[in-house]
Amino acid sequence: NTSLAIFRDLNKCILCGDCVRVCEELQGQGILNYAHRGSELQVMPAFDKKLDQTKCVGCGQCAAVCTTGAITVKNQIGQAWQALHDPKNRVVVQIAPAVRVALGEEFGLPAGANVMDKLVKALKLMGVEEVYDTNFAADMTTISEAQEFLDRLKNGGPFPMFTSCCPAWVKYLELNDPKYLHNISSCKSPMEMFAAVLRDKYREKDA
């Protein structure tokens, strides 16, 4: 379990092959496959490599189709609770637009229902001091990327300029087409940019 994103528990694997198929056929990666024979049969990367030694981008599709919990997405829930219970910490949360719309379905609400108000109330009850909307940072990122694009126009490139807030997409490019690395925008994602702004804000506030 060396991957930053994926956790595997082979004791729960029933060898159905759903993860193998989605990785190969849907994602085009082919990281997972069957290895060994008979009672030793396992689903694993080729040559017994660890996930961080492969071209796995941590997209999470294998975890999404796993019905037994043999593959799950790693989380930091334990660390979050520790932070909330430490009186020395100021816990601040930012909520991305996709989260406030998608999360409702998990609790049986109609698809697309906006649960921002419920999220804010729940987070406050948990002990979160302040809750912010990442939409604000999306505007900051747009302005920064537009400025970077203008700078590239003036200086003759490099073109095209790629931009994505998805770390799995960036990882895919790094591993599969590294020749395009200089085409990726140097701007941070809205989440990273907002986190930096908040740290500066509270650093000045606490000074």
Regions found by a protein language model. Name each.
Residues K50-T72, E174-P178, N183, C187:
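Helix-enriched interaction subdomains in cytosolic or periplasmic regions
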Residues T2-R8, P45, Q61, E105-E106, ...:
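Glycine- and acidic
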